[in-house]
Amino acid sequence: LVQQYAPMLAAAASIVGSPAIRNRATIGGNIENASPAGDGLVALYGERAEIKLVSADGTRMVPVSKYVLAPKKTARKQNELIAEIQIPKEGCSHQEFFKQGRRNALAISVVNGCVSADANGDALNHVRVVLGAVAITPVELLEVGELVNGKRYTHELDEQVQKIIESSIHPIDDVRASKEYR
């Protein structure tokens, strides 16, 4: 079901950590960690996921894009638990997750992201681009979607997209990569 209805999440989950980590870790833990480089988290942004939180006070739904506030900081209150992760069933016809790390296995992302779109002849529609590890939270590049929607992807359009990306991200220097590399 995950591969069919949430292919970006399936792709991200298939390359997280080691087999031991993949067999014990949870998507909820990946979300709650709130790492800007979290592969599952970035994929959930791309999938437009919502987090269902429950407590003795009741239940509430929070879009994943509003759930992560900063590294290691989420909108979850101390008395709440993540009960469900809901992903819309209808997704785009083309969905891709990508990751760049310093090695092929057990790599924390230097940058990661996902792109989804519907193709209509030569034009792209419903374009969504999300990047991780380029700011304190994953970044959805709304301007890219607005620019690209309904257009044929050309070299000129690609140059405009690159400018939007450069102005929308705020990478940091850390042990994995310099901000210039990111």
Which residue ranges define each predicted feature?
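C-terminal structural segment of proteins
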Residues: 1-182
